[in-house]
């Protein structure tokens, strides 16, 4: 009986020691758990790009008297990692919109809008006097696009990862690039002698 109780207590202690502990972390805190692209990198890149754009003289000129309509193309991932570039694109779009200087056309949702307008205008269930009419959507004046690239170097137990984000703002009427910039992040990892 005593051996069974001791064995059960020992098993409970072992299983309890293997349990996971979950806690909330600060979403704005610097994340340095891996050399891979992470949330800190996303926030840094999005913030630096939008700040650079808003401080640009050419962007100040085009936003001085109006809020231009921008289409933001999803950032292209040219790295060897799986990086959710939609999150980077969303962060940049949100920061730009919150600046109060731009308006946006969400091209990812245009097909859904088209389906809804077709339903409203071609279905007997919808009161035609309240249906939204075709041809009233506004087109973009500018397109923001870019890519994220990386270079990875390994030397023995050391690893070096260099990320570069490049973005451009193009006037869709003239094809002129109104703004362009790059931001860079370098991360390094070294293993200790014992691999700890």
Predicted regions and their residues:
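Short C-terminal domain-edge/linker segments immediately following a structured domain
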Residues: 100-106, 134-137, 174-181
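A structural "domain/chain start" motif
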Residues: 19-101, 109-110, 115, 189, ...
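Bacterial N-terminal signal peptides that target proteins for export
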Residues: 1-7
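C-terminal motif of bacterial Sec signal peptides marking the signal peptidase cleavage site
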Residues: 14-17
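Hydrophobic helical h-region of N-terminal Sec-dependent signal peptides
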Residues: 9-11
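Short, solvent-exposed, polar/charged sequence segments at loop or secondary-structure edges
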Residues: 80, 86-90, 105-145, 149-155
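Amphipathic beta-strand/beta-sheet edge segments enriched in Tyr/Trp
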Residues: 19-22, 141-189, 193
